Structure formats: structure tokens, C-alpha cells
Amino acid sequence: MAVICNTCGLPEDLCACGDLAKDSTKIIIRLETRRFKKKGTMIEGLDPKLNNLENVAKELKNKYACGGTAKEGYVFLQGDHRDTIKDTLVGLGFPESSIELH
């Protein structure tokens, strides 16, 4: 018996909720200075209900070999990764038109 998606009610093999969620998000990438003048890359605009933030953060931390965290609606990575993070997010399935660098 097929597993049913809780969001749309379709079987998981036909479900497109994850793709629709990635298309409708507006992602903002910016540099943030935290305590002791440490810089980090803040990725905001990710919906925690539609995207698994822990998995996104894990992929990004492995790619950039840095520490980071996933909280409600944002992912924070230690260090300045603004120059390459857009290409990585496109590789994870987010549309390039919805990603904005600040």
C-alpha cells in the first residue's frame, strides 16, 4: 500500500509538494556579524513546514566544511560563503530566480 502525503493527499510517488514549496519561496542570503566580530552567512526565507531545514543545513555544512545551525525559517553557516552559496542552493533544487544576495 502506498504512503499518502499529509499535505496534498496524493501517494508519495505522485506528490509534488516539495517542488512547489521550493518554487514559491523567496530566499535571502546575507552576511551577518555575530559576537566577537565573527562573520556568518545567513540564509533566510526557508519555510520550515515545507523544507526540511535540518537536511538543508547538513548538506551545506558538509559542502563548506563549516559549523552552522538551522532554526525557524533560517540557516546560519559560520564564515562568509556568499560567493558560492547560490550555486549550491540551485543544486539542491531551489530556483535561481528566487535567490537574492544582499
Curated annotation (Swiss-Prot):
Keyword annotations for this protein, in alphabetical order, are: Protein biosynthesis, Translation regulation
Which InterPro entries does the record associate with it? DENR/SUI1_TIF, SUI1, SUI1_arc, SUI1_arc_bac, SUI1_dom_sf
GO MF terms, alphabetically ordered: mRNA binding; translation initiation factor activity
Q: Which PANTHER family match?
A: DENSITY-REGULATED PROTEIN (PTHR12789:SF0), DENSITY-REGULATED PROTEIN HOMOLOG (PTHR12789)
Regarding protein family, the annotation reads: Belongs to the SUI1 family.
Q: Which GO terms describe its biological process?
A: formation of translation preinitiation complex; regulation of translation; translation reinitiation
Which Pfam families does the UniProt record give? SUI1
Q: Which organism is it from?
A: Cenarchaeum symbiosum (strain A)
| Entry superkingdom | Archaea
* Name of the molecule in the record: Protein translation factor SUI1 homolog
